[in-house]
Amino acid sequence: MKKNLEATIEEIVTKITDEHGFEMVDVEYVKEAGEYYLRVYIDKEEGISLNECELVSRELSPILDEKDPIKENYFLEVSSPGLDRALKKDRDFVRYQGRDVDLKLYKPLNGCKQFEGELVGLTEDNNIKIIANGKEMEFNRKDVAIVRLAIKF
């Protein structure tokens, strides 16, 4: 149910973001502290502004009210994915090749669940490839809990 709902919302959001030259990055529908939140993450090549997030929110809200895909009361949040954005879609792994990433596994590999390195990209088998400590490593996507852009100070 949740995946179908998120896919429906993604379709609606994508129509709006495409119209403005933005990218629909992700949609999350979560319950936190007894409240429901619909979080929509958008971006563009040079970064998304607060005004652009507000624009999408104002256009999205009446469409969601009309189509009513969510039966519960919820809060709508539209924002950028942040500096440490999660990489989820194939295009993310292409766009951020060469960038440093933090990769976390569901289960330890050789006693380690966290890896940091340079993103090489996706293999033909759809595995994630990074260079960590000068060594090329490949991870099956189903074993990876999350990949985020690393923030370096």
From Swiss-Prot:
It is found in: Cytoplasm. One of its GO terms (biological process) is translation. InterPro entries: Ribosome_maturation_RimP (IPR003728), RimP_C (IPR028998), RimP_C_sf (IPR036847), RimP_N (IPR028989), RimP_N_sf (IPR035956). It comes from the Bacteria. Its main location: cytoplasm. GO terms for cellular component: cytosol. Transmembrane segments: none annotated. Keywords: Cytoplasm, Ribosome biogenesis. The keyword Cytoplasm applies. The keyword Cytoplasm applies. Belongs to the RimP family. Required for maturation of 30S ribosomal subunits. This is Ribosome maturation factor RimP. It comes from Clostridioides difficile (strain 630) (Peptoclostridium difficile).
